Amino acid sequence: MKPKFDGYATQYDAWFMENDNLFQSELRLFQRALGDISGQRVLSVGCGSGLFESMIDHSGIEGIEPSRDMGAIAQKRGVNVIAFGAIEDADLEENAYDVIYLNGSSSYMEDLHKAFAVCKKALKPGGRFISLDVPKESAFGFMYLLAKNLGTFDHPYLNGVMPQLPYPLELCSAGVWHSTEEKINVLKDLGFHDFDYCQTLLKNPMYTNEDVEDAVPGYQSGGYVAIIARK
């Protein structure tokens, strides 16, 4: 099966560059969730084009990416892509990583339990698991689900409420979209503990690119949410 992002790598990066304030807001959340990772072994699951990684010191970051188009760009940006494929099928070294994170990739995974279980097995005891993504229950989640089902952003239901430059429809349509509570429950079922949360994009979607937002604690209001838990 063709990976969902094959053929859309350039479009993905261009969208973030055109929505720079939104990108900077998500980047601040990304940086806050990761914290200081110097000297740690870190794995990015669904590393994409390595756009976010290119904005931080990513010398210790390894990546797994289903799309060869995206992964090739990540490699050029200095991410050590160790495998092309899905995390569910990955054969990772056990108890090897200090941090494993999914930045925007869980929304393209059908079986969260299987994916998160693979990550847990590869984490060191006490290692951190981080999931950053658009919650299904957020305004962005509703907008993407509606556009996916309508097959377009150009519809009377969405007129007057859309951002100027919405996320590419092809990528919305490929998404599964999970709620934050669903992800938390899966992680708890797997035995993760010491949960922490932070969020950004608190404005409605049509206003989120007006200003850069700082990440704030919690998960009940944001359009982009980080869940942090320990093995």
Language model regions located:
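Conserved class I S-adenosyl-L-methionine
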Residues: 1-37, 51-55, 70-73, 130-160, 201, ...
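Class I SAM-dependent methyltransferase SAM/SAH-binding core
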Residues: 43, 48-89
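A short acidic, Gly/Pro-enriched loop at the edge of an enzyme's catalytic core
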Residues: 88-100
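A short SAM/SAH-binding and catalytic strip from SAM-dependent methyltransferases
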Residues: 99-112
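A short glycine-rich, Lys/Arg-flanked "PGG" loop and its adjoining helix->strand segment in the class I
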Residues: 113-128
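Short alpha-helix
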Residues: 173-197
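Core SAM-dependent methyltransferase catalytic element
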Residues: 190, 210-231
